[in-house]
Amino acid sequence: MAGHDVKYGKHRTRRSFSRIKEVIGLPNLIEVQTLSYKNFLDEGLANVFKEMFPIDNFAGTMELEFVGYEMKTPKYTVEEARAHDANYSAPIYVTFRLVNKETGELKTQEVFFGDFPLMTEMGTFINNGSERLIVSQLVRSPGSYFHLKADKNGLESFGHTTIPNRGAWFELDTDAKGIGYVRIDRTRKLTFTTMLRALGFGSDEEILELLGETQLLTDTIAKDVHKNPADTRVEEALKDIYDRLRPGEPKTADSSRGLLVARFFDPKRYDFAPVGRYKFNKKLALKNRLLGLTLAEPIVDPETGEILVNTDTLVTRDVLDLIEPLLDNGLGNFVVEPSDDAVIPEPITLQSIKVYSPKDPERVVTLLSNGNPDAECRVLTPADVISNISYWLGLAEGIGKVDDIDHLGNRRIRSVGELLQNQVRIGLSRMERVIRERMSSSENENITPQGLINIRPVTASIKEFFGSSQLSQFMDQHNPLSELSHKRRFSALGPGGISRDRASYEVRDVHYTHYGRMCPIETPEGPNIGLINNLSSYAKVNEYGFIMSPYRRVDRVNGVVTDEVEYLTADEEDNYTVAQANSPLTEDSRFANETVMARHTGNNIEVEASTADYMDVSPKQVIAVAAACIPFLENDDSNRALMGANMQRQAVPLIDPHAPWIGTGMEHQTARDSGAALIAKHAGVVEYVDGNEIRVRRTSGELDIYNITKYRRSNSGTSYNQRPLARLGEKVEKGDIIADGPSMENGEMALGQNPLVAYMTWEGYNFEDAVIMSERLIKDDVYTSIAIEEYESETRDTKLGPEEITREIPNVGDEALKNLDESGIIRIGAEVKDGDLLVGKVTPKGETDPTPEERLLRAIFGEKAREVRDTSLRVPHGGGGIVHDVRVFTRENGDELPSGVNKLVRVFIAQKRKIHVGDKMAGRHGNKGVVSNIVPMEDMPYLPDGTPIDIMLNPLGVPSRMNIGQVMELHLGMAARTLGIHIATPVFDGASDEDIWDTVKEAGMADDAKTVLYDGRTGEPFDNRISVGVMYMIKLHHMVDDKLHARSVGPYSLVTQQPLGGKAQFGGQRFGEMEVWALEAYGAANVLQEILTYKSDDVIGRTRAYEAIVKGERIPKPGLPESFRVLVKELQSLGLDMKVLDADRNVLDLRELDEDEVMTRPDNTEITPEMLEAQEAIVAQAEAEEEALINADTEK
């Protein structure tokens, strides 16, 4: 027997064909979300307050300090927030201290700071009752970047950009004449020496001494001449910069200095963030550009005076390891003094080392670094600017290297915590202005922190982020896998990211640094391809937001591959050689072969085993969770694998799902981490189980009660239903699955079913990937799912009185009311069809003026019956089903309702959706198709033992698509079912051909794994042997019930009077230009006429046609289409006088073309204008009499 048994959870054992020992398990798959939010609450929120406070008034006499904050208990639990359409959030109270610096008086006060959204255990937020999540964002990291560019003549030059987290950009560039320029915040350029002079290096000699002589520098100095002798060189430089940033404004040296300080050196305006400072120091550190250069000075130990490395030594990795600690401790540090009129006249610490130029080995080049400022320094420093220029000049000498912006060392993840932190910062900065003004304007005696603070900017900023940000998304809740995948997704779009239209091919493409960090397979098809990605299965995000991948460390001294795992970021990995996960190892964990396949900076190379630094932990660390659920992924074309991964996320939860016979071993952890299953929080013994709750007695004696969710409507309209898995008296451990969620079976993910599939054609019904299905799958409810739709009705106060929910509805018979209760609301369990009443509701009608007779009757008998119209909630087309739940919210019960709403009723209707012709099905390998025919069981082809086939697929769907994994799954699946064992074949480490054939043989199947099939209609065997087996097939969310729709009469567009389009508007089918041509080609004049008139926009004609059909009369001739009239009006609005003529060339009024509408009374006598005038006179007289009576009363 090939393979070995592995236990997945308590309830499933699979035979696994994996050969590679995995030293670590998968991390918690949603920790990207949960850890980020936890860090935000623990540190991030306090840090923002510390950044913004203290705030002082303009006079500097008062100061408002931040002391601390506390989160109180949430108003609602998660379930209550969901039911009440509320937010799951906790009130936050911040303590402030107001200090009066003149009197020394302190006032400390706790201020309510709004409700703060809380994350659920599943990594989501409840916002207005619906589950949302914040997708992480992939953005350029702040730091120092250098790039190579070529002009149209092919001349290469280098450019530089300093990108801060917040603040002005600093760029360096070279023009065609070889002059270097600086550009501040995308304004006009000026020579880069101007910037150096502004920093306090006025003379040409100082600049040349600092940076060394290079062609670019000398050419630029020659261009940068002293224009105004009245100013010093430093002042002139400052004014030049001011002129570029504020053109046209009067400039002085002091205002120029102030502006430059504000742009780059003021922490309020400029911020690198810790990640920016880390990247900046790393880029400019001398140790990172010495490798491969020759030293032009000896390296001396500062403590002992010993020469460690001689002049003319080539710096290898070993030499670098020797001098690296010295460089970190400040070897080569020196201080330069800028002139007194510099922008910042303080001493500047730099670090230098002399090397020979690789392009001219005779020349000595001085490399400068910024002296490694500490992480607290989050602004640009003069040392940063100088060392940036030094690095840039060094590139022309062949020293240093340019950056690749698509390298994952230069792109980072902004997770939910950081995104929220930014929103709070935006809110606080808006609030700061208000606080400062109030502090300056109020009377000092009675001022309190509460009086100074207006929390609206902060709460508005957070609310706006959750409500309308591109990164705050409605959670994809089709099934557990789609939930998990959505939480692990990150997007390059959104605020501060790139836009879909400008994204180049390079940004979207797979990069070598994605290995083990970002999935190369799972990404959407269409305009977002490559911009929205998923985290690889083992990847984690570090504190700076860079994605790390785990590797086993290789002990190079004794050649052992240790079980010690290290997480490396993309730029750290570039320094090492990493062996592949499938490199064979001996019993004592050494490489079995002398050479191994390895990766180094994106190149796949064969290296000696002794030179490998690390080894991959697992073959599936390359890909994301959804792709890792596809067995035999290695045998599928990547385009089809992409579709397979994406389509698994669209699977509809079935009534009785089954886990696949052929899995990958990922099913259990995916189900557990998705948040859909119920997980034991503590170890204990199950004391009670039923459909609604599970009680577990902890070992410590306490009782845990777990509520089971039954048939809740998910975000996607599918049924979210949990089933208990734990048994009475069972011992459970912490982290065990005690109840299956939707699309789960025995603690494993179960998106579909395991039908018996044959690859064969059948009467042409599986042309173009269509799927032929046996009636058994309908009878046995194999592919039946439940759809739950929510409908709501609310009563409001109108100008004419309040709306009312009632059984008393005008013109509705008793039959229609039979399922409504006494208050007019449908009962739970009622079966309803299209158009049935769900909630009876009446709205007051606008009353017409009463006639004198009515007025008299009203005076005698009092208030007449109110005029109301029926505004009841009815079942829309295609919405029939069983009423599964009704919820009523009223103010009396203490429910929070929107203003103006008195009562809100929610009705949930569940539909049992059996599989139909037109529903979309798919396998896991991107093989999708639409059900084209449902064949009676007795007509389906059958096996020699009489078992009928369940599904027939077209064999032509395999060769051109190159997804051979489906065929391997088919054969192995048949063997697994025959043997009654579940199988795990992990991706890139699964069952080999030999394993499959051995298992097929073990199951007693034929040598070619094919079989003779018999035609169910004739009983004759088919000519050829056919591949028959078990394949995992899923039913997708694209169901025909949601798409099919029909209309006879319905709503029309206001202007054109043509029917609306689309199912949501109950619209018609568009008969477009090309369809009209088709009918014209056949000369079908009458059909054409009725399509362009009655069925479209001949308003009067269609009404008459309808009447005629109802009365059974001949249909009258059509009139004029409304669109003709619209065209005429359009031309008239352009000033073109357009007239319509009859056959005798008489001008017709457009209105005459329609026969006059005749107004009739209820007794069918015609109403004449005289009658109308007489009626008007009677009304006027009655009004005059009434007015006279009122006047007489007031006079009395």
Curated annotation (Swiss-Prot):
Keyword set, alphabetical order: DNA-directed RNA polymerase, Nucleotidyltransferase, Transcription, Transferase
Which biological process terms from the Gene Ontology are attached to this UniProt entry? DNA-templated transcription
The entry's cellular-component GO terms read:
DNA-directed RNA polymerase complex
InterPro entries recorded: DNA-dir_RNA_pol_bsu_ext_1_sf (IPR042107), DNA-dir_RNA_pol_bsu_external_1 (IPR019462), DNA-dir_RNA_pol_su2 (IPR015712), DNA-dir_RNAP_su2_dom (IPR007120), DNA-dir_RNAP_su2_hyb_sf (IPR037033), RNA_pol_bsu_bac (IPR010243), RNA_pol_bsu_CS (IPR007121), RNA_pol_bsu_protrusion (IPR007644)
Task: Kindly give the Gene3D superfamilies that the UniProt entry links to this protein.
Answer: 2.40.50.100, 2.40.50.150, 3.90.1100.10, DNA-directed RNA polymerase, beta subunit, external 1 domain (2.30.150.10), DNA-directed RNA polymerase, subunit 2, domain 6 (2.40.270.10), RNA polymerase alpha subunit dimerisation domain (3.90.1800.10), RNA polymerase Rpb2, domain 2 (3.90.1110.10)
From the UniProt record, list the reaction(s) this protein catalyses. RNA(n) + a ribonucleoside 5'-triphosphate = RNA(n+1) + diphosphate
- Top EC class, one word: transferase
Q: What is its EC number?
A: 2.7.7.6
Matches recorded under PROSITE patterns: RNA_POL_BETA
Which superkingdom does the taxonomy of this entry point to?
Answer: Bacteria
Query: Which function does this protein serve?
Result: DNA-dependent RNA polymerase catalyzes the transcription of DNA into RNA using the four ribonucleoside triphosphates as substrates.
Q: How does it assemble?
A: The RNAP catalytic core consists of 2 alpha, 1 beta, 1 beta' and 1 omega subunit. When a sigma factor is associated with the core the holoenzyme is formed, which can initiate transcription.
Q: Which family does it belong to?
A: Belongs to the RNA polymerase beta chain family.
Can you name this protein?
A: DNA-directed RNA polymerase subunit beta
Where does this protein come from, organism-wise? Lactococcus lactis subsp. lactis (strain IL1403) (Streptococcus lactis)
